[in-house]
Swiss-Prot record:
Keywords: Calcium, Metal-binding, Repeat
Name of the protein: Calmodulin-like protein 8
Positions bound to Ca(2+) 1: 22, 24, 26, 28, 33
Gene Ontology molecular functions: calcium ion binding
Underlying gene: CML8
Residue positions binding Ca(2+) 3: 95, 97, 99, 101, 106
Tissue expression as described in the entry: Expressed at low levels in leaves, flowers and siliques.
One Pfam family it belongs to: EF-hand_7
């Protein structure tokens, strides 16, 4: 995973959040501390779900989450939200009439602007490959799935 540079303000903010989880101030979040915070948010995770959360974040496998591990998680989440925002912006470029769907004509228009001369058949084929529900156009969820599968 590539490192995401966090600002000093972000690190300070994440340290404050970490301290909310770390009730006894020992520098690590235990399953019990995690449970307390999650339950305070009106969620009721099972013991297994709590252990799964810890295991996912706990890179040194000691059963707790230290601040460095918490920071890695937060950096990863920020990266994911940036990628989501980029996909939304890309979708808007294609969805000229902003109706929530990319039609064959909208796709063709964008491809021409990008210097790609596609036949109607090629454009239809591109729509067909991305159009999972078969309605003849590409909605945002289908667009995201298509973009993820490109990588």
């Amino acid at each position: 995973m590539e490192e995401t540079a966090l600002t000093k303000d972000q690190i300070t903010e994440f340290k404050e959040a970490f301290c909310l989880f770390d009730k006894d101030g020992d520098g690590c979040i235990t399953v019990e501390e995690l449970a307390t915070v999650i339950r305070s948010l009106d969620q009721n995770p099972t013991e297994q779900e709590l252990h799964d959360i810890i295991t996912e974040i706990d890179s040194d496998s000691n059963g707790t989450i230290e601040f460095a591990e918490f920071l890695n998680l937060m950096a990863k989440k920020l990266q994911e939200s940036d990628a989501e925002e980029e996909l939304k912006e890309a979708f808007k470029v294609f969805d000229k009439d902003q109706n929530g769907y990319i039609s064959a004509s909208e796709l063709s228009h964008v491809m021409i602007n990008l210097g790609e001369k596609l036949t109607d058949e090629e454009v239809e084929q591109m729509i067909k490959e991305a159009d999972l529900d078969g309605d003849g156009q590409v909605n945002y969820d289908e667009f995201v799935k298509m973009m993820i599968n490109i990588d």
